[in-house]
Design a protein with these regions (language model features):
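Core transmembrane alpha-helical segments of multi-pass membrane transporters/permeases
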Residues: 136, 141, 151-153, 160, ...
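Transmembrane alpha-helix interface/packing and boundary motifs in multi-pass membrane proteins
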Residues: 214-218, 249-258, 290-296, 381, ...
Length: 654
């Protein structure tokens, strides 16, 4: 049974997540070579994090990209029909080229730095090879969307009647002088504004380390701990299995950063339980997908987006975590509200307590695994150490702490397997970050972000609300089919400057873009997380996507709330104001949930549902008058619903 379940999970991952379509070597020699290569990659990054080795920035990033490219061409076949049992002859050539690039960078580092982007012929050749390797690697892992975006941006950089390689002017606001191939490649290859830019810096440090941490935690049983705690706490309550799905997916999703992998991992367990107590196939799948997407919005790791956000904005990581916490929790609260209301409406009970794990026994068995998490929180927020150093020390502590009990004890083979899995798991994220570097590099070279900001503001007629709506649509379109990291970077590069120019706080603008880029995973027609959940539940994929939008509707409103009211992000506020804003936001989210479900204490008619929605929208703004009106509608709804519920009870008794 376990084997069958594993095969199903692998098939689902491969169907909806291209990065899972890896080679499976028959020859044990290839397997061993890949294992030792992966271990080398992991040990290098751990040594860098420890401070034992510290090459110059450009050298380190080129080594990181070179290693990741080498692993990409070793484990990812070129095409779906290509053999997964052996490495194709042309991949050996690509692997050799992947090694040559960082060697060239290492040997010629000082000369490249001295040229300051004025690339010579050899630089141009090496840079061209690097760009081609990155685009091909991204195509194999993420599909065509991300590489095509990168290619379009490169063509845009080359266009220009004055100096461009392509002597055609870009029309309107996007006009620029144009660049020749050597200038473009020099910018992308030989400085830290292109491929070796911010996104690769984050993947070579923060992302890699937290993936190692996640793999170690997974090996020592943290996944089972999360599941057992979630089902022990919530499984017996009304609609319990759905609440379990939310808790488990949220906890796991905050660490692993992949909505689809999260759906498959947690959904394989929770979706059948939801169906068993009476939730529909589509609703069960939607709960899993919306909760899994939310994991990327939930601190502390947020699918690694928090680290890139901190680097891009030049602020401390803990500021991102603090700001993102309340909106993410409110998002999950909105899902749980709908789960509770649906369970009450359809009279769906929880699971019998005698069938559930005992919370006390689970804590007794796994309590020590909370020590590394608490230590990580201390290192990130209070110690004064860098995030990199804190993550490295947490990894070491986790390995030691896991040995304290036999249930979590890891052998050397287990640790080795976690290190190998870490290197493999990093490949997809790192390649996406490298490819996104092309977009960032072209944007900085051509001034694209300034032009795009002007275009969005012009389209919105300088209206903040219209600009937010256009930005939302842009982010969701750009985020379709992309992993969370490139989706965030591309959307924030293209759309955030417009919001900032209108006076929105940079952090609020970045989070706004990030939220809607993530929601592309549950929004048809390319709702990959919803479709993966439908594959488990057996429901209709499109209907699952539509139900997912309904469940996540509060999440679509929350970004507007924190843009209009930065206090929700705990910016420029005190504790009392923060509590007030959080409470009014929760009230608004509950009104949305009741309106969507058409149920409170009893069924809600269409007129009352519209009134509830109006109350929720009134609570978006932080003005006292609108808050009082919104809360007034909430109180009136409680009063009216209780009267109607009592009346129904009397009629039923009669």
């Amino acid at each position: 049974m376990a084997t069958e379940k594993t095969i199903d999970q692998k098939a689902l991952l491969e169907e909806f997540e291209r990065e899972s379509r890896t080679r499976n070597f028959v020859n044990p020699i290839f397997t061993k070579i890949l294992k030792w290569t992966a271990l080398l990659v992991t040990f290098y990054h751990l040594a860098y994090a420890s401070g034992y080795i510290r090459p110059e920035t450009l050298r380190h990033r080129s080594i990181h990209v070179g290693m990741i490219l080498l692993m990409t061409f070793a484990i990812y076949p070129a095409f779906k029909r290509s053999s997964r049992k052996v490495i194709a002859w042309y991949d050996y050539i690509l692997m050799i080229l992947s090694v040559i690039i960082p060697v060239y960078m290492w040997v010629n580092y000082q000369a490249i730095i001295d040229r300051v982007g004025d690339a010579n012929l050899t630089d141009v050749i090496m840079g061209t090879i690097l760009v081609a390797l990155v685009i091909e690697a991204a195509r194999r892992i993420t599909g065509w969307a991300l590489p095509v975006i990168g290619i379009i941006f490169m063509i845009y950089a080359l266009m220009g009647a004055r100096q461009g390689l392509i002597p055609i002017n870009v029309p309107g606001l996007f006009l620029h002088r144009g660049f020749k191939w050597p200038k473009l490649i020099g910018h992308l290859f030989s400085n830290t504004e292109g491929i070796y830019g911010t996104s690769v810096n984050v993947s070579s440090t923060y992302i890699f380390l937290f993936i190692v941490f996640g793999e170690i935690m997974n090996k020592c049983g943290m996944g089972k701990f999360f599941n057992d705690i979630a089902i022990g706490l919530a499984g017996h309550t009304k609609g319990g299995p759905a609440k379990v799905a939310v808790i488990a997916a949220g906890l796991l999703g905050s660490i692993n950063g992949s909505a689809i992998a999260n759906v498959v991992t947690t959904g394989s367990f929770t979706i059948p339980l939801m169906k068993k107590i009476g939730y529909s196939k589509e609703f069960s799948g939607a709960v899993s997908s919306t909760a899994s997407v939310g994991g990327q919005l939930l601190p502390p790791i947020m699918g690694a987006a928090a680290f890139i956000m901190a680097e891009t904005l030049g602020i401390k990581y803990k500021e991102i975590v603090v700001a993102a916490a309340i909106p993410a929790l409110i998002y999950y609260l909105g899902i749980i509200f709908q789960i509770q209301l649906r369970a009450s409406k359809d009279k769906l009970d929880g699971m019998p307590k005698d069938q559930l794990p005992k919370v006390k026994e689970t804590l007794k068995m796994y309590w020590h695994l909370t020590i590394p998490i608490l230590f990580l929180v201390y290192m990130l927020f209070f110690s004064g150490y860098t995030v990199i150093k804190g993550a490295f020390l947490t990894i070491l502590l986790t390995i030691i702490i896991a040995q304290l009990k036999k249930e979590t004890r890891m052998s050397l083979k287990d640790i080795e397997a976690a290190f190998v899995a870490s290197a493999k798991s990093t490949v997809s994220v790192a390649i996406a970050c490298a490819c996104v570097g092309i977009v960032i590099g072209v944007s900085s070279l051509t001034g694209f972000t300034i032009n795009m900001a002007s275009a969005i503001i012009s389209l919105g007629g300088k209206s903040l609300l219209l600009t937010l709506v256009f930005t939302m649509v842009t982010c969701m379109l750009l985020g379709m089919g992309l992993p969370s990291i490139p989706a965030y970077i591309i959307t924030v590069t293209i759309a955030a400057p417009a919001l900032i120019e209108l006076g929105i706080a940079p952090l609020a603008a970045h989070l706004f873009c990030f939220y809607f880029a993530m929601f592309a995973n549950i929004t048809p027609p390319v709702a990959l997380a919803s479709f993966a959940a439908a594959g488990i539940s057996g429901g209709n994929p499109m209907k699952t996507g539509i139900v997912s939008i309904k469940l996540a509707l509060a999440g679509f409103i929350i970004p507007y709330m924190f843009v209009y009211n930065n206090q929700l992000l705990l910016m420029n506020t005190n504790i009392l104001q923060g509590i007030q804003v959080a409470i009014t936001a929760c009230v608004g989210v509950f009104l949305i949930s009741a309106a969507v479900e058409g149920y409170f204490h009893t069924k809600v008619n269409i007129f009352m549902r519209l009134v509830m929605l109006a109350g929720a929208f009134l609570l978006i703004d932080s003005a006292l008058l609108t808050d009082l009106a919104g809360v007034g509608i909430f109180v009136a709804s409680i009063f009216i619903q209780r009267i109607l519920a009592r009346r129904e009870a009397r009629h039923a008794a009669a």
